[in-house]
Curated annotation (Swiss-Prot):
Keywords: 4Fe-4S, Cytoplasm, Iron, Iron-sulfur, Metal-binding, S-adenosyl-L-methionine, Transferase, tRNA processing. The keyword Nuclease does not apply. This is tRNA-2-methylthio-N(6)-dimethylallyladenosine synthase. Residues 5-122 form the MTTase N-terminal domain.
């Protein structure tokens, strides 16, 4: 009698890593029958998908591997793998320092995991593959599997911008776009499984230039319109973008494509032109604000979020005040803001880290307080309004209630019935909290005038006619 083989994946970092981890799980289930478990001690394979953005990323990895080594001491056949950006950076060093590790793979080689596992089982020797094969991994992954009404789809990998503080070009490689038709086919498959909202992923999605079936190049703006035309997809989100390639043709999509949500994450990092130059961002604060003005002209109700790095080398009080002014001018809704810490191998790591930790913490506190206040103002403005939300499932606050997300990315908790999950409902916002809203259902999807979704099979069945010889003829 065969026992079920179990897989445990621990994921740190961005949505791209979350997406990669889900693909690893699907891949190893299809090739080896591994079933995901939430209990590391029960697993036959332990995979750590790492992120190198935060300070002391390496030590965090080795600390986790130290715990997993104890499992391997008790169960020698366990296979331990390390992937992600720290694996790309540290490769052989991980093997030297943590000899319990069997497999080391990068973000672009996760599709080779089945072969690596077989090799480790056969030879009992470790495998390291942190190469950058162009986009090959998407050709080797199993068909997508929906896990709710919202799904992530990777459209490109890597980044060519080489900001002075960032490790992404070194850990994920330079920009490579997936073929347009592959993306559209994956999204159509997800839509057929009930996905209503798709989030397009990439380190710099607005640099997307994917090849079409006839050898032409599809821009990001064109891709957005093509995705919006897929039957069943009612909402489109994307992350992350770089200001220097947020072009007018992308902004124009906000004017004529209602499926594209009124929420945008557009990182600026600093409001000081001097610091932006040191960061090698290749744009000014004024140019950033110009993009926002155009966006708000195209979509007046759009909300903007951003990334900010606090205490970058050389940042003065005047530089910080310029960042605070930009925050007020743009009126950001939310931010991902962090104290600067040098990433090994980046140009900024050679700059003197001359802002004290105390000053960094104080500036971060002031920045986050300002943005939290602005976010609360936006939330209060939604009080008593009716918002359309996509119901994602039970609420985290109360499993007897449901939770969904507004178009502008607000979480709403409300009383509802299980049949609402995966559908849209209109709710009146009746209360406002720091990180969520409370709503009351006023309209279900059945009462909305939404476009009718039909599968290709249903269209054929409805339009099929046979001639006198019994040959099927289809007349849409």
């Amino acid at each position: 009698m065969s026992t079920i083989k179990k897989l445990y994946i621990k994921t740190w970092g961005c949505q791209m890593n979350e997406y990669d981890s889900s693909k690893m799980a699907d891949l190893l289930e299809s090739t080896h029958g591994y079933q995901l478990t939430d209990v590391a001690e029960d697993a036959d394979i332990l995979l750590l998908n790492t992120c190198s953005i935060r300070e002391k990323a390496q030590e965090k990895v080795f600390h986790q591997l130290g715990r997993w080594k104890n499992f391997k001491d008790n169960k020698p056949d366990i296979i331990i793998g390390v992937g992600g950006c720290v694996a790309s950076q540290e490769g052989e060093y991980i093997r030297q320092r943590a000899q319990c590790v069997d497999i080391i793979f990068g973000p672009q080689t996760l599709h080779r995991l089945p072969e690596m596992i077989n090799q480790v089982k056969g030879t009992k020797s470790p495998v390291v593959d942190i190469s950058f094969p162009e986009i090959e991994k998407f050709d080797r992954l199993p068909e997508p599997r929906a896990e709710g009404p919202s799904a992530f789809v990777s459209i490109m990998e890597g980044c060519n911008k080489y900001c002075s503080f960032c490790v992404v070009p070194y850990t994920r490689g330079e920009e490579v776009s997936r073929p347009c038709d592959d993306i559209l086919f994956e999204i159509a498959q997800l839509a057929a499984q009930g996905v209503r909202e798709v989030n397009l992923l990439g380190q710099n999605v607005n640099a997307y230039r994917g090849e079409t079936f006839d050898g032409q190049i599809c821009s990001f703006a064109e891709l957005l319109r093509l995705v919006a035309a897929i039957d069943g997809i009612d909402r489109i989100r994307f992350t992350t973008s770089h200001p220097i390639e947020f072009t007018d043709d992308i902004i124009a999509v906000y004017e004529d494509t209602p499926e594209l949500v009124s929420f945008l994450h557009l990182p600026v990092q600093s409001g000081s032109d001097r610091i932006l130059t040191l960061m090698k961002r290749n744009h000014t604060a004024l140019e950033y604000k110009s993009i926002i003005r155009k966006l708000r002209k195209a979509r007046p109700d759009i909300l903007i979020s951003s990334d900010f790095i606090i205490g970058f080398p050389g940042e003065t009080q005047d530089d910080f005040e310029k960042t605070m002014k930009l925050i007020a001018d743009v009126n950001f809704d939310m931010s991902f803001s962090f104290i600067y810490s040098a990433r090994p191998g980046t140009p900024a790591a050679d700059l003197p880290d001359d802002v004290s930790e105390e000053e960094k913490k104080q500036r971060l506190y002031l920045l986050q307080q300002r943005i939290n206040q602005q976010a609360m103002n936006y939330s209060r403005a939604m009080l008593n309004s009716v918002q359309r939300i996509l119901v994602e499932g039970p609420s985290r606050k109360n499993v007897m209630e449901l939770s969904g997300r507004t178009e502008n990315n607000r979480v709403v908790n409300f009383e509802g019935t299980p049949d609402m999950i995966g559908k849209f409902v209109d709710v009146e916002i009746v209360d406002v909290y720091a990180n969520s809203l409370r709503g009351k259902v006023v309209r279900t999807e059945d009462q909305m005038d939404l476009r009718i979704h039909e599968s290709p099979e249903s269209v054929i069945a409805r339009t099929r006619k046979e001639d006198e010889l019994g040959v099927g003829v289809y007349q849409p």
